[in-house]
């Protein structure tokens, strides 16, 4: 069993999906979040208030984050730096995109020197990863492994493939380190062992099972017009199930996407983060590399 709680700094935190996933694997405490989006930072603050996330300060700008006060106090750096420069949904400008925050992420890694780095991004980052990110991590003294994971592997109804990267500063490891890594990797599936990025167990789609509805509870509805806010409010107060699953955008009550949906869309599925950490820890163990925590 783990002997202590490991401190993490979360960059480009989103709603804290990576941190929630890590909790399923090892005892961690987030000591600082870095998140520039005001609406998403508000979600983080709300989740801290509700007790879902660790209470910690939120720094708003990765570019101005001072690593000096945190040096030697952080065990793991986690983050999913912006995917827009590499996503197929955008222009894929890569390293030329001003939103590319890998150089700033690398600055934090050099300044903090965390024993372990755990990162996430879209598959479109692969070329940049092999040409820039992995070589730079190795130059910093890290052993690096990576894998392709999808939400469907953990039972979600959507694929949502993501690249996860696990980097470790130590290549030998003490007995305690080896035992700790074995704990992290316990219950994980065996990795493919191939070079480069491997697809870590595409298990196929999981068939969803919806609950049966008691039709006797329902009466015919005649929905109000799109602009009739009072009418919609009355109807949904009587039959809240009538509100679309894709909330607050299709029922005429608002013209914008709910901020929670934006946070979810940019975030990490916690179960996928947990699985990725277990599998990649197992890879490092097989290679003789053990997180020095």
Segments predicted by a language model, with ranges:
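Class I S-adenosyl-L-methionine
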Residues: 2, 65-74, 84-262
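SAM cofactor-binding core of SAM-dependent methyltransferases
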Residues: 6-63
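N-terminal Rossmann-like NAD(P) cofactor-binding module of classical short-chain dehydrogenase/reductase
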Residues: 9, 76-78, 118
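Short, structured active-site "lid" loops
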Residues: 46-82, 166
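Flexible, glycine- and charge-enriched loops at secondary-structure boundaries
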Residues: 55, 94-98, 270
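Nucleotide phosphate-binding/pyrophosphate-handling subdomain across enzymes
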Residues: 269-272, 279
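Short, hydrophobic alpha-helical segments
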Residues: 277-288
């Amino acid at each position: 069993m783990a002997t202590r709680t490991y401190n993490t700094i979360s960059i480009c935190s989103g709603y804290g999906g990576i941190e929630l996933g890590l909790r399923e694997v090892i005892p961690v405490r987030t000591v600082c979040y870095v998140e520039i989006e005001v609406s998403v930072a508000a979600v983080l603050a709300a989740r801290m208030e509700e007790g879902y996330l660790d209470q910690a300060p939120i720094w708003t700008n990765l570019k101005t984050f001072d690593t000096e006060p945190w040096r030697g106090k952080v065990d793991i750096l986690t983050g999913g730096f912006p995917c827009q420069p590499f996503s197929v949904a955008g222009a894929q400008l890569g390293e030329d995109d001003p939103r590319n925050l890998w150089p700033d992420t690398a600055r934090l890694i050099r300044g903090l020197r965390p024993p372990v780095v755990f990162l996430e991004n879209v598959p479109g980052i692969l070329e940049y990863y092999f040409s820039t990110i992995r070589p730079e991590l190795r130059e910093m003294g890290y052993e690096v492994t990576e894998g392709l994971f999808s939400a469907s592997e953990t039972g979600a109804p959507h694929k949502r493939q993501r690249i996860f990267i696990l980097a470790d500063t130590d290549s030998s490891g003490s007995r305690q380190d080896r035992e700790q890594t074995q704990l992290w990797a316990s219950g994980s599936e065996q990795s493919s062992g191939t070079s480069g990025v491997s697809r870590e167990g595409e298990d196929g789609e999981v068939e969803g099972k919806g609950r049966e509805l008691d039709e006797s509870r329902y009466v015919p509805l005649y929905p109000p017009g799109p602009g009739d806010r009072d009418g919609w409010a009355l109807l949904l107060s009587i039959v809240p199930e009538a509100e679309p699953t894709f909330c607050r955008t299709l029922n005429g009550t608002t013209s914008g996407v709910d901020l929670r949906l934006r946070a979810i869309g940019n975030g990490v599925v916690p179960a996928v983060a947990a699985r990725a950490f277990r599998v990649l820890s197992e890879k490092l163990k097989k290679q003789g590399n053990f997180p020095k925590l």
